[in-house]
Amino acid sequence: MATSDILESLIEKDNGYLITSKAVESGVSKPSVSKYVREHDMEKVAHGIYILDDVWPDELFVLQQRNKNIIYSGETALYLHGLIDREYSHICFTVPTGYNATHIKKKNKEVRYANPEILDMGTCEIPSSSGNLVKVYDKERCICDLIKNRKKYEIQLYQTAIKEYMSSKEKNLSRLIEYAVKLGVRDEVMMYVEVMV
């Protein structure tokens, strides 16, 4: 397969993004990527990440491509799952305890830390608002984290997310309770399950 065909295939797969590391993994040299970017007038959105001129930048996708350790959580994940209707005011993500996140702790970013035993519990991939797949916590993990950290959330957001989840046909109560036990919020979660289901 020709270099341009490989790159076009990668761009199509990533919704208009060309990620240098993925191109190199596919056998394309960095100089060939640079040449393609110049010839197709692609815009650089981050180190090693380029987009076509007709593509709107997706901050969540770009941030995660640059930082593979992050998992979207909190308000960001609640919004992506449709559990709250108001877009998140800041990007919230979780990283492993001990991870040095100073390079991404910037305006409108909230970094949370989790122990390795629970870090990957409940991870899944869903489309961002722009349609690119990003790694987030599933609905059940989001609800458990929400209940565990309830004082950090506005009451309206908290109530909306709980109500939306409990009234959803897609809820998985056995998984919710399993996570609640591991996160130490079983009693609080059971209170909502008993009252709202």
In which residue ranges do the predicted regions lie?
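Short helix->loop/beta-hairpin flanking segments within DNA-binding domains
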Residues: 3-10
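A short, conserved structural fragment
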Residues: 41-47
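Nucleic-acid-binding surface
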Residues: 6, 16-22, 49-197
